[in-house]
């Protein structure tokens, strides 16, 4: 099996995420070659493997200790699969909480599927949380993109 090439990129300026960005925010970007429809990319990308579900479960248990939004692993996965804002060019979902706000974008442009996460930490806990989950976040995002490219080359 050929390993899909997931590129780390500056997210395209056409994204709705850019109007949110301020100094101190986090915004990453990835892309893979694929001309799949966003609805299909969304369905494949957010059908998480068991190791991701386990990480989300640990995250949710940790967040509940601090009284922050956590939901069950399944409800968080459902949130990520719900993409309520958008069209066939871009879909954005997210959540606001006491410690940070986040949005995830899937965008289709020029034969590529792009994925980005925007985060605005509100306090020290939000910044610490972001620093703690970032290594896992990168692996999960790259995995999502690779699974999309494998399913729809």
Task: Cite the ranges covered by each PLM segment.
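Short, highly charged C-terminal tails/helix-capping segments
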Residues: 149-153
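Extended Gly/Ser/Thr-rich low-complexity repeat segments
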Residues: 44, 48, 105-110
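Intrinsic-disorder/low-complexity, polar/charged segments enriched in Ser/Thr/Lys/Arg/Asp/Glu/Gln
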Residues: 25-31, 90, 112-114
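A short acidic/glycine-rich loop-to-helix N-cap element
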Residues: 119-140
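Hydrophobic-ligand binding "helix-grip"
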Residues: 72-109
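Hydrophobic ligand-binding cavity/cleft-lining segments
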Residues: 1-71
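Short acidic, glycine/tyrosine-flanked loop/strand segments centered on an H-E-D-like triad
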Residues: 106-125
């Amino acid at each position: 099996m050929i390993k899909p090439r997931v590129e780390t990129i500056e997210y395209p300026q056409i994204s709705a995420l850019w109007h949110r960005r301020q100094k101190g925010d986090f915004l990453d970007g990835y892309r893979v070659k694929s001309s799949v429809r966003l609805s299909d990319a969304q369905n494949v990308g957010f059908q998480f493997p068991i190791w991701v579900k386990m990480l989300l479960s640990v995250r949710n248990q940790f967040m509940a200790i601090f009284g922050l939004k956590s939901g069950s692993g399944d409800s968080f996965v459902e949130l990520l699969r719900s993409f309520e804002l958008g069209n066939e060019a871009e879909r954005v979902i997210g959540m606001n909480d006491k410690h940070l706000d986040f949005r995830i974008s899937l965008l289709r442009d020029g034969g590529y599927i792009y994925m980005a996460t925007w985060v605005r930490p509100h306090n020290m806990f939000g910044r610490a949380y972001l620093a703690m989950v970032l290594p896992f976040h990168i692996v999960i995002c790259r995995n999502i993109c690779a699974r999309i490219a494998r399913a729809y080359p």
